[in-house]
Swiss-Prot record:
<feature type="glycosylation site" description="N-linked (GlcNAc...) asparagine">
    <location>
        <position position="667"/>
    </location>
</feature>
<feature type="glycosylation site" description="N-linked (GlcNAc...) asparagine">
    <location>
        <position position="1203"/>
    </location>
</feature>
<dbReference type="InterPro" id="IPR003593">
    <property type="entry name" value="AAA+_ATPase"/>
</dbReference>
<feature type="compositionally biased region" description="Basic and acidic residues">
    <location>
        <begin position="1507"/>
        <end position="1522"/>
    </location>
</feature>
<dbReference type="GO" id="GO:0016887">
    <property type="term" value="F:ATP hydrolysis activity"/>
</dbReference>
<feature type="transmembrane region" description="Helical">
    <location>
        <begin position="131"/>
        <end position="151"/>
    </location>
</feature>
<feature type="transmembrane region" description="Helical">
    <location>
        <begin position="1020"/>
        <end position="1040"/>
    </location>
</feature>
<feature type="transmembrane region" description="Helical">
    <location>
        <begin position="27"/>
        <end position="47"/>
    </location>
</feature>
<keyword id="KW-1003">Cell membrane</keyword>
<keyword id="KW-0325">Glycoprotein</keyword>
<dbReference type="GO" id="GO:0042626">
    <property type="term" value="F:ATPase-coupled transmembrane transporter activity"/>
</dbReference>
<keyword id="KW-0677">Repeat</keyword>
<dbReference type="InterPro" id="IPR044726">
    <property type="entry name" value="ABCC_6TM_D2"/>
</dbReference>
<dbReference type="InterPro" id="IPR044746">
    <property type="entry name" value="ABCC_6TM_D1"/>
</dbReference>
<feature type="transmembrane region" description="Helical">
    <location>
        <begin position="531"/>
        <end position="551"/>
    </location>
</feature>
<feature type="transmembrane region" description="Helical">
    <location>
        <begin position="311"/>
        <end position="331"/>
    </location>
</feature>
<dbReference type="GO" id="GO:0140359">
    <property type="term" value="F:ABC-type transporter activity"/>
</dbReference>
Length: 1557
C-alpha cells in the first residue's frame, strides 16, 4: 500500500526491508540506490566517456534526420526530470537515505555523456549504441522495484510521480535508440549485412533473422536470399588475417599446440565477448535449486498470511530466471559460433595460401583435402565447447558447495565420482586423438583413390576396372569402418561417463546421508531437502557431462589443429633460380644455366648433371631424348619447381606459360578456359582461336565456345582436350590458346602437341610455331619438349639429353647433324612445303551462345525429412531399430523414474522418519546399476552394429551410383561436387550423425518421460501439455522449412570451394609459372565468403530455435506455477516439487535436444544429398542388359558394326552415323581421322560408353547391347589415351589388377617393357606407385604390360601411343606385333607412319566412315587417308622408300634383260640336251639374287625373247608400282624365304626412329 513505510526502515543496507513494508517482500531503498542506481550510472559515465573518445574521430556515416533530432529532444525532458528529482530530494523535510542525493546527482550527470554519445553514435556508427541501449534497458528494469519502493515511503508521492514520468521518457528513448538507421546511412557506408544495423536487443532476441525464416517458410531459398555477413566473419581480402600475423610470429612452429596461441590472440576480444553472457547463463541455471526450495517451503507453509504475495513474487522470479536462461544461453552460444565462423574463415584461407607455396613434388592432394574438409569441420564442431569448459568448472564448484549445504559430508560423493569420470575422460581423450588420426588416415586413403577414379573415369571404364575399383574402394571403406569402431568405442566410454555421473551420484550421496542421518526433523531426508538436492544433482550431472564431453572434444580439436600446424609448418617452395624481372635488352638470353645439377631436394642424388645451356630471346628451342631421360625434369627446372643442387640458373622473365603432358581443364566453358581471367578482346581472341584450329570445333558445338567442357574435359575428345586444355588458362595444363592470349612472352611446352591428328598438328605447328606463326610474329620465346623429331629443322636451338641425365648435344639443327651423324635420320634435309593459304590465320567470328548457367536449387532442399529418415532407417533391418529403441526406452525409464522413487521416499520421511529406509535404498541402487548396464548395451548396439552397417550401405549405394553413371554424367558434373559426397557428406554421416542420433533419441525420450512425470505430479498442468507439444510442433515445422534448405545450401556451397582447391593442387606448377597464385587466392576467398553465408546463418537459426524453445519452457513453467498458486490449498508440496525438479531436467533435456537436433539435421542434410544423388543419377545399365557372355567369348575375335548410329545426350544429334564394317579374327585395324572426327567415339560405342540410337554391334556374333556393360569391358582389353596409374597401390596391383598371373609372369612382362630395372632397385612388385616414379611414356608402358597380362582376344588402343617418344612408340608397336599377333587389334591413332603394315584403315570424319581399305591401297590412289598421310612425319620417308624400291626394281629388270640377252647369245653353244640344266641353273641364280634384294623381283622364269628391249613393258611395270603398291607375285611375303616388304619397311622405320637413342 502506498505510503505505508517510513524512511527509517529503508535507510540501511538491508537488503530486505522490515515486515512493515509489503510484509518484508521488498529491498531497502538504500540497497536499491547503491546497486540499482549508483552502480549503473557510474558505469555508464565511465563507459560512455571512453566510447566518446574512441568514436569521435570516426568518419560520418549517417545523416542526422528526424531520428537524431527526436532522440536529443527526448533526452532534454529526461534530464529535466532528474534535475527536478534532485531539487525535491534536496528540500528539507523530504524523506531520503544517505545515498539518495549521490544517486540522483549521478543519474543526472550520466545524462551528459549519454547525450554526447547519442549524438556521436548516431552519426559515426551504423549500429545503435550498445552502451546506451544496455544502460536504458537495465535501468528500466531496475526502476520498477525503485518506483515501487519510493511509492511505499510516506511523503514521496510527488517524487514517485516525477520518477515514473522520467522512467516513461527513458522507455521512449530506448525505443528510439534501438531504431535502425538503415535509411539514413550515407551510400558509401551502406552495408548489406543485417547484423551491421541491429542493436544489442535485436541481436539478443534474434529478430534480425526473422525475415529469412519467414521467406524460407514460404518459398525455396536461393543464394541471393541469404543475408550478407559482417566483414569480420569473412576472409581477409589481403590475406593478412590476424591469425596469420600471430602465426608468423611463432618461433617454434614444430611444437605441438603451437597453433592454439595465435588463434587465441587473434580472437581474444571475440572470445571475451562470450564470457559475460556465459556467466549470466551459469548464474540463472544455478538459481533453479533456490526456486525449487522456496516453492516447496511456500507450499509446505501455505497457510501463512503472506503466502499469496510471496507466490506472486515467486512467479516473477521464475519469469526472470527462465527468461534469463533463454536469452543468456542463446547469446552465449551465438557469440561462440561467431568465433567458430571467424576461425573457419581464417584456417581455410591459411591452408589454401600454404598450398600455393608448397613444393609440388611433396604435395599430397588427399592430405590437403582432408585438412580442408574433415579437420576443419572437426575443429569447428568441437569449438562449441570453447566457453563450456571453464564455465563447467565454476558451475561444478558452486553446485558442490550447495550440495554440501544440503547433505553435509554426503555432498563429497559427487566430487569423488566426478573426479574419477574426469580423469578417465582425460585418459580416453588421449587415446581418442591417436585413434582418430588412424581413422582420418583411412578416410584420406579412401578419398584419394576415389578422387583418382573420378578424374580418370573414362580410362577406368575402358580398362574394365569398374567392378575391381568398386570392390577395392568398398574394401577401403570397410577398413575405415573398422578403424572408426576403435574410435567409437571410446565415444561410447565418453557417453557412459557422462551418464554414469547422472545415475550414480544421487544414489551414493542419498545412501550416505540416509545411513548417517538421525530422526530429527532437521536431519531427515525430507521433501524440501531431497527435491532441492535432486535439482542440484541433475544440474551437477549436466555440468560434469559437459565438462567430460568438452575435454574429449577439445582433445580431438587439438589433434586436428596439430595436423593443420604440421601442414602450415612445412618448408615452403623456394625458387632456386635467379629471376630478373627488370627490363632487359633484346640480346639478353631468356634462360641461362651454368653447370647445374638438378634434383628433387637437397641431399638427394641429382637427376640431371652439369647442365649448361642458353635459351635466346624470341627463339624456338626443342628438347629431345629417350623416354625417362629427364626432359620433363629439365622443363620443371626452368620453371623453378626442381632444386638446383649445384650451379646457377638465371631467368630474365617473371612469368612463363607452362603446358604439361596431360590435358587438363577446369569445369567451365571453353572461352573461360582460354581467357583465364584476362579481359575479352574479340579480335585477338578470334585470332588465337583460329591459330589453334578451334573454329571448326566451335561451329560443331551447339553452344560454341560457351560449351562447358566438364571436369578434366571428359566431355571432349582427346584431341579437343589437348588443344583446349593443354593451353588452359585457369587450372589445367596450359597450352597455346591460353599462352598466346595471355600475352606471356615465354612458353614452355612439355610434349603438348602429342595426340593430335596430322592435319591438326600441322595446322597448329604452322600457325603458331612455324616460321610465320603467331609465336614468331609476337616475338615469343618457346621451349618445346617433343617427340616429333621431323620438326627439328624448324628449331633455332636443339637440346638432346642423354639417358644418364647429361646433355648429349645442343645447338642448331645443322650443328647437331654435323656432330652426330644419326641425327640426320630425325628429319628431312629441308622442311616440307606446307600447303597453307596464309601463315597468319585470319580472325574468325567465334560462335556465341547463352552463358552456361548452374543448375537451379535442388528440390531436395525442401524435401520431406520423413523421406530422409526413412532412407536412413532402411539401411539396416527393422528389427535392429526395434531392439535399439527398446533398449533406449528401458534405459530412459531407469534414469527418470528414480526421481519419483526419491520423492516417495521423502514423503514417507515427512510422515515417519526413515521408514522403509533399507528397501528404498536397495531399490534405488537396483535402478542405478540396471540403468548403467542398459546405457552401455544401447550405445554399443547402435554405435558398433547399426552405425557400421549404415556406413557400409550408404557408401556402397553412393559408390555404385557413381561407377554405374554414364559418361554424360561425368561430362556435365564437376568432379569436386561428386568428390564432396565421398568426403564432406560421408564425413558428416560417419562422424556427426551417429552421435547425434544417439544423443537426440536419448534427449527426446527423456523429454517425453519428464513430461509424463510432470503431468502425473501436477494434474492440472496435464491439460496444457498437449498445447505445449502443439507449440513445439508448430515451431519445429516453421524452423525446419528454412533450416532444411540452409543445411543443404551449406553443404552445396562447399563444392565449388573444394573444386577450386583441387584445381589448385592439380595445376600448382602451371599456376606458379603464370604467377596466378594471387588470382587463385582471391577466388578462394570469394568462394569461402559465399560458403560462410549459409554456414553462419544455419548456426543463427539454430540459436533462434534455442531461444524460442527455452522461452516456451519458461512459459510452461509460468503456467505451471500459475496453476499451482491458483490451487495452492489443494496442491501437494512434494508433488509440485517433483514437477519442478523435472522442469529443471526438462530445461536441460530441451537444451540437449536442441543442440543434438541441430547437429542431427545438419548431418541429415548429407543423407538427403546422398539419397537425392542415388535416386536422380541415371544408371548406364539398361533393363535389357542383363546377360553374361559365354566363357569363351571373344575367342573368335570378330567385331561387326551394322548401321550403327550413336549419341551422347540427344538422340536427334548422333555423333556416329550409319557405320558398317566387320573386323575378322587376328586382323589389325587402324582408325584414323582429324581430332573430333569420331575415332574415340567409335571405340567408346564398342565399350558401351555411349548409347546406340540404331544399328547393332556384335562381337563373336553376340549383340553387345544385350550384355552387361562391365562384362563387355572386362572381356575386351582396352588401353586409354591417358595412362591409368592407381597411386598408393602396389605395382603388382596396377599391372595385374585381376590377379591373373604369378609373380614370375608379371616380372617377365615388366622386363619386356623395360621397367623392371627401375622397380628392382626399389621394392619390386610391392613398390608403391607414385607420380614421380615413372615418366609419362613409362606409365604408358606400364599400361601396356597390364594389357599383355590380360585375358582376351580383342584389344583396343585409344590413342595409347600419342604421348610417347618414337623409341617408346616403336617398342609398343613391336609389342603389338609380337604379343598380340593372334589378337584382333583396333588402334585409334594419329601416328599414321606406325600403321602402314596394318591390314586395314578406317578413316572417320564427323562421325561418318569415309574409307575402309588396306593402307597401301588407300595410299595408291587419291584418298582422304593419303591426304592425312601426307601431313604425317612418315610421308617423306614413305616416298623415299617407294622411290628407292622402284629404282631397285628398274635395275633388276635391266639386269634381268641383260642376262636374258647373254643367255640367248649362248643358246647356239648349248645343245638341246643341255638346255634344261642351264635353265635350271639360271633359275637358281635368280632365286639367290631375289633373296639378296628382299624378294622384290618377280618370280618369273627367263624365257627366250628378242634382243630388242621391251621399253613399253618396262614403262607399264614402272607405272604399276609408281602408285605406291606392288602387284607382282613377290610383293607380299617376300618370295622364297626372303624378307617381306612389311619387314623391310618396319626395319627401315625402326632404324630411322631410333636415331638419337
Amino acid at each position: 500500500m502506498a505510503g505505508s513505510c517510513t524512511i527509517d526502515e529503508h535507510n540501511h543496507f538491508g537488503p530486505i526491508v522490515g515486515d512493515a513494508c509489503y510484509g518484508g517482500l521488498d529491498f531497502t531503498l538504500y540497497f536499491e540506490e547503491a546497486f540499482l542506481s549508483i552502480f549503473p550510472a557510474a558505469t555508464l559515465i565511465l563507459a560512455a566517456t571512453v566510447r566518446c573518445f574512441l568514436v569521435r574521430s570516426a568518419s560520418l556515416k549517417v545523416r542526422g534526420g528526424w531520428l537524431h533530432t527526436l532522440k536529443l529532444l527526448l533526452l532534454a525532458p529526461y534530464s529535466i526530470s532528474q534535475l527536478l528529482l534532485l531539487a525535491f530530494w534536496m528540500r528539507s523535510g523530504t524523506p531520503k537515505t544517505d545515498l539518495t542525493i549521490a544517486s540522483t546527482v549521478l543519474r543526472f550527470i550520466a545524462t551528459l555523456p549519454c547525450g554526447y554519445l547519442i549524438h556521436l553514435q548516431h552519426h559515426r556508427s551504423l549500429r545503435p549504441s550498445k552502451i546506451i541501449s544496455i544502460y536504458f534497458l537495465l535501468t528500466l528494469l531496475f526502476d520498477i522495484p525503485l518506483a515501487r519502493t519510493i511509492w511505499t515511503i510516506q511523503g514521496l508521492r510527488t517524487v514517485s510521480a516525477i520518477f515514473i514520468a522520467g522512467t516513461v521518457v527513458k522507455a521512449l528513448l530506448l525505443i528510439l535508440e534501438t531504431w535502425e538507421k538503415r535509411r539514413l546511412v550515407r551510400p558509401m557506408y551502406a552495408s548489406p549485412a543485417p547484423e551491421d544495423w541491429t542493436g544489442v536487443i535485436n541481436r539478443s532476441l534474434f529478430w534480425w533473422i526473422n525475415p529469412l525464416l519467414f521467406r524460407g517458410a514460404r518459398t525455396s531459398l536461393s543464394v541471393g536470399d541469404l543475408f550478407h555477413l559482417e566483414s569480420c566473419m569473412l576472409p581477409d581480402p589481403d590475406g593478412k588475417h590476424r591469425v596469420v600475423m600471430h602465426w608468423e610470429n611463432v618461433t617454434n612452429k614444430d611444437k605441438a599446440g603451437a597453433m592454439v596461441v595465435p588463434i587465441a590472440k587473434a580472437f581474444k576480444w571475440d572470445l571475451l565477448a562470450g564470457v559475460f553472457p556465459r556467466l549470466c547463463q551459469s548464474g540463472f541455471i544455478i538459481s533453479q535449486p533456490f526456486l525449487v526450495r522456496a516453492t516447496v517451503e511456500l507450499f509446505v507453509y501455505r497457510d501463512r498470511p503472506d503466502s499469496r504475495s510471496k507466490a506472486t513474487l515467486l512467479i516473477g522470479a521464475y519469469a526472470l530466471v527462465y527468461g534469463g536462461i533463454a536469452i543468456a544461453t542463446a547469446t552465449a552460444q551465438h557469440k561462440t559460433y561467431r568465433v567458430i565462423t571467424m576461425m573457419r574463415a581464417a584456417l581455410v584461407d591459411m591452408i589454401f595460401e600454404k598450398s600455393t607455396a608448397i613444393n609440388a613434388h611433396k604435395n599430397d592432394d588427399s592430405a590437403a583435402l582432408t585438412l580442408m574438409s574433415t579437420d576443419i569441420e572437426r575443429i569447428t564442431h568441437c569449438g562449441r565447447y570453447i566457453h563450456d569448459t571453464w564455465a563447467s568448472l565454476i558451475e561444478i564448484g558452486i553446485a558442490l558447495y550447495l550440495l554440501y549445504n544440503e547433505l553435509d559430508t554426503a555432498g563429497i560423493a559427487p566430487i569423488i565420482i566426478a573426479f574419477g569420470c574426469t580423469v578417465t575422460a582425460m585418459k580416453i581423450a588421449m587415446m581418442a586423438g591417436e585413434r582418430q588420426n588412424l581413422w582420418i588416415e583411412a578416410i584420406q586413403k579412401r578419398v584419394a583413390i576415389t578422387a583418382e577414379m573420378l578424374g580418370s573415369m573414362k580410362g577406368v571404364k575402358i580398362s574394365g576396372l569398374t567392378d575391381l575399383l568398386f570392390n577395392k574402394i568398398q574394401a577401403l571403406r570397410e577398413h575405415e569402418i573398422l578403424a572408426s569402431q576403435k574410435f567409437r568405442s571410446l565415444l561410447i566410454a565418453v557417453v557412459g561417463l557422462s551418464n554414469f555421473n547422472t545415475l550414480m551420484t544421487p544414489i551414493v550421496s542419498f545412501t550416505i546421508y540416509a545411513m548417517g542421518s538421525g530422526d530429527a526433523p532437521n536431519e531427515i531426508l525430507g521433501s524440501a531437502r531431497a527435491l532441492t538436492s535432486l535439482t542440484l544433482f541433475n544440474l551437477f550431472a549436466v555440468f560434469i557431462g559437459t565438462l567430460v564431453e568438452s575435454i574429449s572434444e577439445t582433445a580431438m580439436a587439438l589433434e586436428c589443429l596439430d595436423r593443420i600446424r604440421n601442414y602450415l609448418a612445412q618448408e615452403a617452395h623456394q625458387d632456386p633460380r635467379e629471376v630478373n624481372s627488370s627490363p632487359v635488352t633484346e640480346k639478353t638470353p631468356c634462360i641461362e644455366a651454368f653447370e647445374v645439377d638438378v634434383g628433387w631436394k637437397n641431399g638427394d642424388e641429382s637427376i640431371l648433371h652439369r647442365l649448361s645451356y642458353r635459351i635466346e630471346r624470341h627463339s624456338l628451342t626443342m628438347i629431345v631424348g629417350a623416354v625417362g631421360c629427364g626432359k620433363t625434369t629439365l622443363v620443371k627446372a626452368m620453371l623453378g619447381e626442381v632444386n638446383c643442387l649445384t650451379g646457377k640458373m638465371k631467368v630474365n622473365c617473371d612469368r612463363m606459360a607452362y603446358c604439361g603432358q596431360d590435358a587438363w581443364l577446369t569445369n567451365g566453358s571453353i572461352r573461360e578456359n582460354i581467357l583465364g581471367g584476362s579481359p575479352y578482346d574479340p579480335p585477338w581472341y578470334s585470332t588465337v582461336v583460329a591459330a589453334c584450329g578451334l573454329e571448326k570445333d566451335f561451329t560443331e558445338l551447339t553452344a560454341g565456345d560457351q560449351t562447358a567442357v566438364g571436369s578434366k574435359g571428359v566431355s571432349l575428345s582427346g584431341g579437343q582436350k589437348q588443344r583446349l586444355g593443354s593451353l588452359d588458362v585457369l587450372t589445367r595444363a596450359q597450352a597455346l590458346a591460353r599462352a598466346l592470349y595471355s600475352g606471356v612472352e615465354t612458353i614452355l611446352l612439355d610434349d603438348a602437341l602429342s595426340g593430335l591428328d596430322p592435319v591438326t598438328d600441322e595446322h597448329i605447328f604452322t600457325q603458331v610455331l612455324g616460321p610465320n606463326g603467331l609465336a614468331r610474329k609476337q616475338h615469343l620465346t618457346v621451349v618445346m619438349v617433343t617427340h616429333a623429331v621431323h620438326r627439328l629443322p624448324y628449331a633455332d636451338h636443339i637440346i638432346a639429353l642423354n639417358t644418364d641425365g647429361t646433355i648429349l648435344v645442343q645447338g642448331t639443327f645443322d650443328d647437331c647433324c654435323k656432330r652426330l651423324d644419326y641425327i640426320q635420320g630425325f628429319a628431312i634435309a629441308q622442311p616440307p612445303a606446307i600447303q597453307m593459304k596464309s601463315a597468319m590465320p585470319k580472325a574468325v567470328e567465334v560462335t556465341k551462345a547463352a552463358p552456361y548457367s548452374d543448375e537451379a536449387i535442388s528440390d531436395a532442399r525442401r524435401s520431406s525429412d520423413y523421406q530422409t529418415y526413412l532412407y536412413y532407417l532402411t539401411t539396416v533391418p527393422w528389427h535392429n531399430w526395434l531392439v535399439y529403441f527398446g533398449l533406449m526406452a528401458i534405459f530412459v525409464f531407469l534414469q527418470a523414474f528414480p526421481t519419483v522413487w526419491v520423492t516417495w521416499w521423502a514423503r514417507d520421511n515427512d510422515a515417519q522418519p526413515n521408514k522403509n529406509r533399507s528397501m528404498r535404498i536397495g531399490v534405488y541402487w537396483m535402478f542405478g546399476v540396471l540403468g548403467a548396464c542398459f546405457l552401455l548395451a544401447t550405445a554399443c548396439f547402435y554405435m558398433l552394429k547399426i552405425v557400421a552397417k549404415t556406413a557400409s550401405v550408404i557408401h556402397s549405394r553412393l559408390l555404385r551410383t557413381v561407377v554405374n553413371a554414364p559418361m554424360s554424367f561425368f561430362a556435365s558434373t564437376d568432379s569436386g561436387t561428386t568428390l564432396n559426397r565421398f568426403s564432406q557428406d560421408l564425413e558428416l554421416i560417419d562422424m556427426e550423425l551417429p552421435l547425434a542420433v544417439l544423443q537426440t533419441c536419448l534427449a527426446l525420450f527423456l523429454c517425453v518421460a519428464q513430461l509424463i512425470i510432470i503431468a502425473v505430479s501436477a494434474r492440472y498442468i496435464t491439460a496444457t501439455i498437449p498445447l505445449c507439444v502443439l507449440v513445439y510442433c508448430i515451431i519445429g515445422t516453421f524452423y525446419m522449412r528454412t533450416s532444411r534448405q540452409l543445411r543443404i545450401m551449406e553443404i552445396e556451397a562447399k563444392s565449388p570451394l573444394f573444386s577450386n582447391f583441387m584445381e589448385l593442387l592439380n595445376g600448382l606448377i602451371t599456376i606458379r609459372a603464370f604467377n596466378w597464385a594471387e588470382q587463385y587466392k582471391l577466388r578462394n576467398r570469394a568462394l569461402l565468403a559465399e560458403s560462410q553465408r549459409p554456414y553462419y546463418l544455419l548456426y543463427a537459426v539454430q540459436r533462434w530455435l534455442s531461444l524460442v524453445l527455452d522461452m516456451t519452457v519458461a512459459g510452461f513453467v509460468l503456467v505451471l506455477m500459475g496453476i499451482a498458486v491458483g490451487t495452492m490449498h489443494s496442491t501437494n508440496a512434494s508433488s509440485l516439487g517433483l514437477a519442478l525438479v523435472n522442469v529443471v531436467s526438462l530445461s536441460a533435456s530441451v537444451k540437449a535436444l536442441i543442440t543434438d537436433w541441430t547437429v542431427l539435421e545438419t548431418s541429415l542434410g548429407a543423407v538427403t544429398r546422398v539419397k537425392h544423388f542415388a535416386e536422380s543419377t541415371e544408371s548406364e545399365d539398361m533393363v535389357q542388359e542383363r546377360d553374361l557372355p559365354p566363357e569363351d567369348w571373344t575367342s573368335r575375335g570378330t567385331v561387326e558394326y551394322k548401321n550403327v548410329s550413336a549419341f551422347y545426350r540427344d538422340p536427334s544429334k548422333p555423333v556416329l552415323k550409319n557405320l558398317s564394317f566387320r573386323v575378322h579374327k587376328g586382323e589389325k585395324v587402324a582408325i584414323v581421322g582429324r581430332s573430333g572426327s569420331g575415332k574415340s567415339t567409335l571405340v567408346s560405342a564398342l565399350f558401351r560408353m555411349i548409347e546406340l540410337c540404331e544399328g547393332t554391334i556384335s562381337v563373336d556374333g553376340i549383340d553387345i547391347t544385350t550384355l552387361r556393360r562391365q562384362a563387355i569391358r572386362s572381356a575386351i582389353i582396352g588401353l586409354p589415351q591417358d595412362p591409368l596409374l592407381l597411386e598408393g597401390s602396389t605395382i603388382r596391383e596396377n599391372v595385374d589388377p585381376f590377379d591373373y598371373c604369378p609373380d614370375e609372369a608379371v616380372i617377365n612382362t615388366l622386363k619386356r617393357v623395360g621397367l623392371w630395372e627401375i622397380l628392382e632397385s626399389k621394392d619390386g612388385l610391392e613398390t608403391i606407385a607414385s607420380p614421380e616414379l615413372f615418366s609419362h611414356g613409362q606409365k604408358q608402358l606400364l599400361c601396356m604390360a597390364k594389357a599383355m597380362l590380360r585375358h582376351g582376344n580383342i584389344i583396343v588402343f585409344d590413342e595409347a601411343t600419342s604421348g610417347v617418344d618414337p623409341e617408346t612408340d616403336e617398342m609398343m608397336q613391336e609389342l603389338i606385333r609380337s604379343c598380340f599377333a593372334q589378337h584382333t587389334v583396333l588402334t585409334v591413332t594419329h601416328r599414321l607412319d606406325t600403321i602402314i603394315d596394318y591390314d586395314r584403315v578406317l578413316v572417320m570424319d564427323n562421325g561418318i566412315l569415309l574409307e575402309s581399305d588396306p593402307p597401301r591401297t588407300l595410299l595408291s590412289r587419291p584418298s582422304v587417308f593419303r591426304e592425312l598421310y601426307k601431313s604425317s612425319r612418315g610421308w617423306e620417308e614413305y616416298e623415299r622408300q617407294e622411290r628407292a624400291e622402284a629404282e631397285a626394281r628398274r635395275r633388276e629388270r635391266v639386269e634381268k634383260e641383260r642376262a636374258e640377252e647373254e643367255l640367248r647369245g649362248r643358246r647356239g653353244l648349248i645343245s638341246e640336251k643341255e638346255e634344261p640344266e642351264t635353265v635350271s641353273a639360271i633359275r637358281e641364280h635368280w632365286n639367290v639374287v631375289n633373296q639378296l634384294f628382299g624378294g622384290i623381283i618377280p618370280r618369273a622364269v627367263p624365257r627366250t625373247r628378242s634382243r630388242s628391249r621391251d621399253h613399253s613393258a618396262e614403262r607399264r611395270e614402272s607405272k604399276r608400282y609408281s602408285g605406291g603398291d606392288w602387284t607382282g607375285e613377290g610383293d607380299g611375303d617376300g618370295g622364297d624365304g626372303g624378307l617381306g616388304r612389311r619387314d623391310t619397311r618396319r626395319h627401315l622405320t625402326g632404324l630411322a626412329a631410333r636415331g638419337l637413342h
